[in-house]
């Protein structure tokens, strides 16, 4: 089991939590981004830089994902793709993507895209909060307790 991170938009506080978890649980955490990422020295942490381009990082994450892996992303289509491969998907706010909720999330995303295309301001997500970080940490700890190294 490895943790793959859609790192371009992942909050720094979440990356720091993942770095600590990698060392503590001795699991591989791979950050994928289209820019250089500084990571702490650890045999459990690595960064993969992909060329700039639409969904290039997402495609690499899908390519790397295997059944049972954990993918950290706020990207709904990416979450759907890794779920199709048997991986788990968690957003940086601690919300799980699942077979039960992914279709609804994709539909909502498509509707919001249509509204934006029509010139309607749909706003955006609320700013990342300390509560979001705590929720993420709790969900990550639970996942690692169930699926981490034996």
From Swiss-Prot:
The protein's name in its UniProt record: UPF0178 protein BceJ2315_16760
Organism listed in the record: Burkholderia cenocepacia (strain ATCC BAA-245 / DSM 16553 / LMG 16656 / NCTC 13227 / J2315 / CF5610) (Burkholderia cepacia (strain J2315))
InterPro entries: UPF0178
Family: Belongs to the UPF0178 family.
Organism ancestry: Bacteria, Pseudomonadati, Pseudomonadota, Betaproteobacteria, Burkholderiales
């Amino acid at each position: 089991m490895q943790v793959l991170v859609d790192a371009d938009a992942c909050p720094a506080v979440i990356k720091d939590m993942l770095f600590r978890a990698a060392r503590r649980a001795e699991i591989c955490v791979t950050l994928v981004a289209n820019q250089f990422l500084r990571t702490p020295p650890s045999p459990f942490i690595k960064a993969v830089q992909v060329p700039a381009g639409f969904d290039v990082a997402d495609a690499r994450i899908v390519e790397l994902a295997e059944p049972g892996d954990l993918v950290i992303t706020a990207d709904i289509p990416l979450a759907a793709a890794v779920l199709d491969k048997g991986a788990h998907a968690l957003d940086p706010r601690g919300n799980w993507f699942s077979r039960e909720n992914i279709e609804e999330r994709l539909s909502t995303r498509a509707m919001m895209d249509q509204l934006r295309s029509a010139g309607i301001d749909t706003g955006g997500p609320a700013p990342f909060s300390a509560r979001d970080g705590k929720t993420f940490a709790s969900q990550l700890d639970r996942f690692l307790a169930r699926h981490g190294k034996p």
